[in-house]
């Protein structure tokens, strides 16, 4: 399948770009959604935006909508609930379906699926109490990374190097999610790899002076480094792309997605997570990877939208 869309922009009909929502990633979604909306309108698509709120069901019933471009990050938009609602309404939409969206949003279940298939992912534990923190420290050792199981954009994440810091980080992460994970820290370079219409795009190497690629490094900092080409040998880059393809296939992603991967000192890659509605801001990674593959931002959003026609009519 070609990365480029050959469809006339008018063939998409009236497109609702869904963004905002109520998740902790609302501000990122607003930026992503407005960027997508502007690009679609500039391309000649009959697109309009909906900031998804309490009146969304009324908007859905009252507006003429031929298809939806989902740019909702986090819970309520990326977790299968919006996908299920649109399925019930008979409205085709971009990206992954209900099951893959729900699975990818749940970091614990995603890791369990990968582990069952023999795909490498860091050792982990679930934290529900101070005793869990102490047991995880004894089993996994330090340093560790703490993360809410159902949040994105590195919200609520922290790197810790003591039991006391682990307990504090667990308590902080629990403000965002009732399920908190702690993972073995993988020391080494981080890569992110996008998949678009079944094709793995050029990997991006990430560098930051922060202790890890956190929210500030992703969206605010000007000192974050992005390497395209990623700096790997041809053989290791091919291995990384193949691992990403297998990881996304295991989850069942569709249309577009992005996987985050670490590499340890021995050269081993470790899967962290998959995002089914990646960011589309001026700092975002999928647009960077698409540019490296020869697609500008407008061509990228048209390709994502075209997949909704080919996959869902």
Curated annotation (Swiss-Prot):
Q: Which GO terms describe its cellular component?
A: cytosol
Q: Which GO terms describe its biological process?
A: cell wall organization; peptidoglycan biosynthetic process; regulation of cell shape
Going by the UniProt record, its keywords in alphabetical order are: ATP-binding, Cell shape, Cell wall biogenesis/degradation, Cytoplasm, Ligase, Magnesium, Manganese, Metal-binding, Nucleotide-binding, Peptidoglycan synthesis
Pfam families listed in its UniProt record:
Dala_Dala_lig_C, Dala_Dala_lig_N
The signal peptide, as residue positions, is none
Q: What does the record's cofactor remark say about binding?
A: Binds 2 magnesium or manganese ions per subunit.
Q: EC annotation?
A: 6.3.2.4
Pathway the protein acts in:
Cell wall biogenesis; peptidoglycan biosynthesis
InterPro entries documented for this protein? ATP-grasp (IPR011761), ATP_grasp_subdomain_1 (IPR013815), D-Ala_lig_Van_CS (IPR000291), D_ala_D_ala (IPR005905), Dala_Dala_lig_C (IPR011095), Dala_Dala_lig_N (IPR011127), PreATP-grasp_dom_sf (IPR016185)
The subcellular localization recorded is: Cytoplasm
What this protein needs as a cofactor is: Mg(2+); Mn(2+)
Q: Where does Mg(2+) 2 bind?
A: 273, 275
Where does the chain bind ATP? 137-192
Recorded catalytic activity of this chain's protein: 2 D-alanine + ATP = D-alanyl-D-alanine + ADP + phosphate + H(+)
Q: Which family does it belong to?
A: Belongs to the D-alanine--D-alanine ligase family.
HAMAP family per the UniProt record, alphabetical: Dala_Dala_lig
The entry's protein name is D-alanine--D-alanine ligase
- Annotated organism of origin: Ectopseudomonas mendocina (strain ymp) (Pseudomonas mendocina)
